[in-house]
Amino acid sequence: MEFKTYSDFFDKNANSIINWFEGELAKVRSGRANLKILDNVRAEYYGEQTPLIEMASLSIPEPREILIKPYEKSSVNLIQAALLKANLNLTPVVDGDKIRIKLPLLTEENRKENVKKVKAVGEKAKQEVRFIRRDTLNKIKSDKIADKDLNKYFEEQVDKITKKYIDQIDSILAKKEKDLLSL
């Protein structure tokens, strides 16, 4: 029996958790413009709820500004309405055929609240990694490895991999916290 089967299972699942975690952190405002905060915004477009990325080009001309240039001028007001409806605490300003969003400076209170949010998301990600650890250990047990030493070795390796992913989450979290707390 090879450990690679178990490590591949663990890595595949843990990497998807890391990707989810990074995506969630990108949505939390840090005072700098980030297009990820618009990922869930959808506007009515030809009768369908359409993601902004499919209706307009999105860019960051300045560190605290997002520029939205709709592909069709007629959709400017639809996009503005969708941004207001999305409840992101942003003020979209129509500037001719484009929309500008100036990101306000975050207050100390907002920053601390955002740190709490990212810590909660970090805990959720760690919990998911621990669930993967449990599932991997259950797979090892269900395969009924006769050699007790090999079984123990596999469990130790799973613990090492778990620690690696938990440390990776902690590192990403620390970087985001630093970003949130810096002015």
Curated annotation (Swiss-Prot):
GO cellular component terms, A-Z: cytoplasm
InterPro entries given in the database record: Ribosome_recyc_fac, Ribosome_recyc_fac_dom, RRF_sf
Keywords: Cytoplasm, Protein biosynthesis
A Pfam family the protein falls into: RRF
One MF annotation (Gene Ontology) recorded for this entry: ribosomal large subunit binding
HAMAP family with a match to the protein in the record: RRF
NCBIfam families given in the database record: frr
UniProt similarity note: Belongs to the RRF family.
Stated role: Responsible for the release of ribosomes from messenger RNA at the termination of protein biosynthesis. May increase the efficiency of translation by recycling ribosomes from one round of translation to another.
Protein name, UniProt field: Ribosome-recycling factor
Top-level taxonomy: Bacteria, Bacillati, Mycoplasmatota, Mycoplasmoidales, Mycoplasmoidaceae
Gene name linked to the record: frr
